[in-house]
């Protein structure tokens, strides 16, 4: 896969992926498949300055998106990730997370993942890469997982 900064002109291609309701069924915002709702999501992604369009290198078509958000001195959140259903069960998410985490750890000590409490699919994926559930974090409909730079290097997923 290839990840590059998201651009305004990517809206139509990314919405073609995002308009599948099943992508959003476990996300806190179940209605992101609707164009108006996705347009707001896309606008926030652009405003974040850390959003990426994820492309399949073979087809050169968009297959998803993710972004860096909420930078602090030690930590960066990686989130708002979604992929076309045809990518589920393959290595796309793992590859993307590896790229993003490796990049983040050039500048920060910890990667944070905030996931909807009922999003079993995303929680399982993050646990597979070695992120640990933060039992001290507030439970506000979301759970927080953290991955330390030292653990990432040791795990080498």
Where are each of the predicted segments found?
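GNAT-family acyltransferases
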Residues: 1-90, 103-105, 110, 117, ...
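Conserved active-site tyrosine of GNAT-family acetyltransferases
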Residues: 126
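Conserved beta-strand-loop-alpha-helix junction that forms the acyl-donor binding cleft
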Residues: 113-123
């Amino acid at each position: 896969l290839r990840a590059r900064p998201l651009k305004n002109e990517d809206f139509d291609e990314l919405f073609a992926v995002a308009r599948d309701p099943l992508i959003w069924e476990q996300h806190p915002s179940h209605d992101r498949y609707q164009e108006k709702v996705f347009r707001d999501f896309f606008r926030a992604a652009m405003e974040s300055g850390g959003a990426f369009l994820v492309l399949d290198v073979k087809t050169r078509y968009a297959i998803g998106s993710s972004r860096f958000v909420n930078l602090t001195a030690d930590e960066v959140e990686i989130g708002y990730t979604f992929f076309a259903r045809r990518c589920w069960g393959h290595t796309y998410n793992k590859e993307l997370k590896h790229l993003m985490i490796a990049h983040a750890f050039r500048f920060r000590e910890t990667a944070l993942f905030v996931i909807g409490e009922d999003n079993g699919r995303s929680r399982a994926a993050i646990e597979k890469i070695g992120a640990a559930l933060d039992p001290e974090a507030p439970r506000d409909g979301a759970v927080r997982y953290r991955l330390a730079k030292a653990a990432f290097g040791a795990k080498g997923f």
